Amino acid sequence: MERVAKFLKEAETYYLATVEGDQPRVRPFGTAHIFEGKLYIQTGKVKDVSKQIHANSKVEICAFKNGKWLRVAGELVEDDRREARQSMLDAYPSLQNMYSADDGNTEVFYFKNATATFSSFTHEPEVVKF
């Protein structure tokens, strides 16, 4: 999982896919943080992506850097603890201009039942489960 988080941070931007009814939705994200041994992402409760995750927790992310790409498929679980939100904000200080741990909007999720696949055109895919 550390390798997954490192790749996502180095890529800086990854794309999170959710579903809304029968329509796929994809948008750029930038947060990837390990807290208590789990891979977390962050969003705001007022965003459509939050509503989509709550309706269907199965998501997939994809990132690309230096000719290699990473896909992570799994379920997102909300962690409503203040310390989880604060840990994310501490890891990404620039978010503190828009979010705070106690604003009622900041929301963090961790991956469970996740399968990460590292791929390139020159190597066989490598799969990591967490």
Can you name each region flagged by the protein language model?
Residues 32-66:
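A short mixed-secondary-structure module that forms the rim of ligand-binding clefts
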Residues 29-32, 74-76:
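Hydrophobic/aromatic beta-strand elements that line small-molecule binding cavities or substrate pockets
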Residues 1-2, 43-47, 93-94:
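Charged, amphipathic alpha-helical segments
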Residues 71-130:
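Charged, gly/pro-rich active-site loop segments
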Residues 6-20, 59-61:
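A short, Trp-centered hydrophobic/proline-enriched beta-strand micro-motif
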